[in-house]
Each structure stands twice: as structure tokens, then as C-alpha cells.
């Protein structure tokens, strides 16, 4: 089972990663949070939106979907990435770069599987 790991940044803010059962990071917070409570709210937003539809921006003439959604895209280095956007359009999570689009899609599926029931662990400073 996956888990959300909340940690404190060097500047005293908070961030989170969603890790799969194997310990691999499958989603990182797209921002840092000024308080632990606001970071936990970010985690809850990921949970709530973890089974959203996928807007495949790697396809020419892709159909724009409503929020919440995962946006699948190709970065400047040619790797496939995704970001999770909440109902209000705010970016709440982002992925690492994947060489293969299929791997990125597997990452999205893993979020849908892991996030809803994932434990939340707050790392000690």
C-alpha cells in the first residue's frame, strides 16, 4: 500500500510525496506549504482527485477536459510527464519524467490505486 510522506523543507515549509508500496515516488507536491495543516489539505486534495480523467496533451488536437484532471504532456527534454489539477484548476501534484508514455499512464493508474487509502507519515525534522 502507498503512503504520503510529508517533510519539512530547508526554508521551514512543508511538502509531500506520494510513494507506491515499493517506495517509488509517483507524485510530488507542486508547491510548498507554509503550515503542516495546509500541506495535509494538499494531500486530501490529491486523494479526492486521484481518479480524475486524463487529458492527453501529447496528441495533436487533443480534447480539452474539465477539471479535475491529469494533464499528460511532453516536456522540453522529450520526456512524458503529468500533473494533477484540482476542480479549481490549481496544480496540486506533478510527476517525474518518463521515457515512455505507457510508464506515465501506469503512474497515473498507480495514484488512483494508492492515494485514496494511503497512510500519511510526517517525517521528523
Report the location of each language-model feature.
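Intrinsic disorder/low-complexity detector
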Residues: 1, 47-76, 118-125
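A structural feature that tracks compact, well-ordered secondary-structure segments
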Residues: 3-7, 13-33, 42-45, 69-75, ...
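Negatively charged, low-complexity tracts enriched in Asp/Glu with abundant Ser/Thr
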Residues: 28-60
